[in-house]
Design a protein with these regions (language model features):
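Conserved AAA+ ATPase "sensor/coupling" helix adjacent to the nucleotide-binding pocket
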Residues: 177, 193-202, 231-232
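P-loop/Walker A NTP-binding region and its immediately flanking N-terminal helices
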Residues: 1-145, 152-161, 169-173
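Conserved AAA+ ATPase "SRH/arginine-finger" region at the nucleotide-binding site
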Residues: 180-190
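Conserved H-loop
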Residues: 165
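C-terminal helical "lid" of AAA+/P-loop NTPase domains
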Residues: 212-217, 223-235
Length: 242
């Protein structure tokens, strides 16, 4: 397993940086009324990791028991469109932009189906199901309009978590219906702390000059930094670590 997957935080308490954002997510979990959410920020900053940790905090460890399904949709000319769904009993993750110009069709069908389906686990901590929409800023205007209508109609039993690099291409009616959560690129010191944590867990010594170089060249992309660390693993005894 790659380091980036092996050491990805699974709980809010394990998140390594942006403590103010972690506190905000913990407050959301404690709240009885969770709004639609829009996570935005540069690639590799940790948006998906925070969404995954939030889902576990909302629903428990069952949110990490995932399955992958391939769904087939027919466009107006009866051509098949295949889209992969990642789901647990409590949430579904989709990337509608995989459907290209037919993303509106995917949004309408999947969200309507999920919204009209009862929570599988009757003892679930939350009565609503959650849909995570990746690359929300790549959705067409038609798909975003369909999404807006869905947000209004099915708020009672469904919440949306949108993930995007930027909010600039997301229509105002969607932004106004979401709590905006910015996940900024971490500082080099934050990235270095993550790298030291991985190195310690893997029992090898990571010189400060190497971790500094990796962090600087990663330009705030933690995923990239960890991948580079694995490639450049320094074969020095763990006894150097305190």
């Amino acid at each position: 397993m790659l380091y980036v997957d092996k050491y990805r935080p699974k709980d809010l308490s394990e998140l390594n940086y942006h403590p103010h954002l972690t506190e905000q997510l913990e407050s959301l979990v404690a709240s009885a009324d969770v709004p639609h959410l829009l996570f935005y920020g540069p690639s590799g900053a940790g948006k998906k990791t925070r969404i995954t940790c939030l889902l576990k905090a909302l629903y428990g460890p069952g949110a990490h028991k995932l399955k992958v399904d391939q769904r087939v949709f027919l466009n107006p000319s009866k051509r098949k469109i295949e889209v992969n769904l990642i789901s647990s009993n409590y949430h579904t993750e989709i990337t509608p932009s995989d459907a290209g110009i037919y993303d509106r069709l995917v949004i309408q069908d999947i969200l309507k189906e999920i919204a009209q389906t009862q929570q599988v686990d009757q003892n679930a901590a939350r009565r609503f199901k959650t849909v995570v929409i990746n690359e929300a800023d790549s959705l067409s205007r038609d798909a975003q309009a369909a999404l807006r209508r869905t947000m209004e109609k099915y708020m009672r039993n469904m919440r949306l978590i949108l993930c995007a690099n930027s909010t600039s291409r997301i229509i105002a009616p969607i932004r106004s219906r979401c709590l905006l959560l910015r996940v900024g690129a971490p500082k080099d010191e934050d990235v270095m702390r993550v790298l030291r944590h991985v190195a310690k867990r893997e029992k090898f010594h990571l010189p400060d000059n190497i971790s500094s170089d990796i962090a600087r060249n990663a330009d705030g992309n933690v995923r990239k930094a960890i991948l580079v660390l694995e490639t450049l693993r320094v074969p020095v005894s763990y006894t150097h670590l305190t």
